[in-house]
């Protein structure tokens, strides 16, 4: 039986196993508090994320279960990896992952990025997205604060709490506004992996410019700012809008012409502009895919088709439409955690026997 110790962080009780010590707050989100800690077993520094009240409602239980399943499944150099998970005596859930020193949001607010760093960061974002998308997963909330970076400039995508299955009928109001793809605003119904490419394009533009590209004050203002730069959406895109109210709103806007991105990003490499234009396309069907972006000439210093793996198998989303009570989600969660530790123990036993 694991021994647990308690600590107070920002008025929140952290109840962790004695394997971890020296807790220091790193960040607070809507669904959890993250601390850095020392892993006394390995000697490395880790991030410990406490999921707040994971069993308070069926919706939160399902969200936590989904994030756990995704963290267990996704194994890629540019995606955050799970190193431990446990449930405390107070029935809080803790995810333990590798610790990276900072995130892209903090980097962007501290200083301008040099060209080679912009290239390398974008390459790693697209490399991670290629893998995630090939697993049948859409992140849905890609933004600078969800992109972690260490002192070696290694980059990892994190926070898959909003991630969803690839589904042409996907619904919902997700993603931080500045990085939200227009099809989420326009249709509220049909979107797919291309929303992540749009978000990556907004992040790319922010790295080039040093500030958010589309800093909308609200939903309507956000769309208006996008059209000021990219022009009015083509008719064939407008005709895909499912909501009559949204359709009337878009048709009521003044017609705008697309502005050349080169006129806004005057200091940027022409190849960077070319790739950005392919990422920020209104029509998701015409938007460049993550795998195609990797092969763009702008990223040629890093592109290696033999080292840009796709997922070996697609993620199993069979649970996603289930409407289950909290107790059932809790049992499923316990089962996943036991399975995780059994796999780890089996791997360790195999290593020791060799």
From Swiss-Prot:
It comes from the Eukaryota. The keyword Nuclease does not apply. A motif (TXY) lies at residues 171-173. The modification Phosphotyrosine is found at residue 173. The active site is at residue 141. Its main location: cytoplasm. Its EC number is 2.7.11.24. It is found in: Cytoplasm; Nucleus. One of its GO terms (cellular component) is cytoplasm. Belongs to the protein kinase superfamily. Ser/Thr protein kinase family. MAP kinase subfamily. HOG1 sub-subfamily. This is Mitogen-activated protein kinase hog1. It comes from Botryotinia fuckeliana (strain B05.10) (Noble rot fungus).
